[in-house]
Amino acid sequence: MVLGIGLDIVETERLGRPLDGPGGFAERVFTAAELAACASRADRVQALAARFAAKEACLKALGAGILEGGLRQVEIVSDARGAPRLRLTGTLAERARRYGVRHAHVSLTHEPSFAAAVVILEGTKTRAARPARRRDAGAWTLETLLNGTW
């Protein structure tokens, strides 16, 4: 049974500026493993932008806002074939367990100007029904992340 679907799109240039700038944006958003996996790629910014989009899509699929679960609690890893997979930690992993999530499908795509991701969560319905999303759950902007006010 599908428990949640999330979709996100990112303008790569807008994300690329803070990735290469001062302020620790990359370290606040990505895990060390994600940064290492993309470090030597020719399409580094696009690859990180796709991972950023997947993190956002995962939060949407879980019905969580950015303030409820940090982006570093969603890690995008590759399986043996190189396909993207989600690894959840902290409160987001607990939330997924409570909701009965058993499998996550992740699809990433990018072009020079945009990156996008879709996350589909499957599992069995549990008694812990997913609460309605808070009205302000998505009330933030990329600038909020850049300024570290989340």
Q: What do these predicted regions represent?
A:
Residues 1-150:
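Core catalytic alpha/beta fold that binds nucleotide/phospho-ligands
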